[in-house]
Amino acid sequence: MNVVECKDLTKKQGQQNALNDLSITIKENTITGLIGRNGAGKTTLLKILAGYWYETAGEVRVFNEQPFQSLFVSANVIYVDDQMSFSGRLTLADILKEANRFYPKWDAKLAERLFDYFSFQPNQIHIHLSKGKKSTFNMIIGLASRCALTMFDEPTTGMDASVRKDFYRALLKDYLAHPRTIIISSHHLEEIEDLLEDVLLIEQGKKYFHLSMDELKEYAVGLTGRTEIIEQWTANKEVIYSRQIGKDTTYCVVKRDYIPFEQAKQLGIEVSSIAASDLCVYLTRKQKGGIDDVFK
């Protein structure tokens, strides 16, 4: 079953399209990483799926319903980001009680255990928390809601490294015990790739690819060797990224269609694997080049 279905989804903001004819499907009970540069359209997509915003054109379905102003979607979807706001009249304990009333699958015991583990006090006020503590409390809401579609938009903003690790471990343990569809938008792909089953990479509001983690890890390889040999050997291959290393050596990343590894070794070319996070950066680099080109 597909929890999310988008066809030719377009969202215009001002004079620009934040999303451009985006077509995707996301299956139930999966953890998907939503990856892209700032301004790629990640937050726009998540807010449309959550029913916060209405699409300009195209079709979007969540649980086979149009999410905008859908009570069913509102009760079964949660969108967590660092801009979540709560009434200044409510204490943290009050917020948890209200969440218990609203979300049908709310796990009060899990919320209480996480609340104690991260050293919150019942009478604290959300707006008075530090940025990292706000993100941590928001994470508790996201996990304890047990919504069938749970979306985290840069959920670890402001968190210490140790808290981020605790969050990812808590998310994975709770997902394994209570499977649901989870989408995580993050700039820290290297931190979450072990959690993910799929990666959706978007660039300029369009889908670049939607692959399983296994497919992504096999997508490309790195080649290092003498510049002349690398240029000749990659002439008919799709080069994703290339840079000069020293005077006569080049490193490049090529799509892994058919790579004769033995021939490469005979030519003195070193073949290496590519980290998923690095590959996504290479794929979405601006056409005008990298930062090194500024100093030429």
Regions found by a protein language model. Name each.
Residues 247-296:
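C-terminal coupling/interaction segments
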Residues 58-72:
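Conserved ABC transporter NBD signature motif
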Residues 50:
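Helix-to-loop junction immediately C-terminal to a conserved catalytic motif
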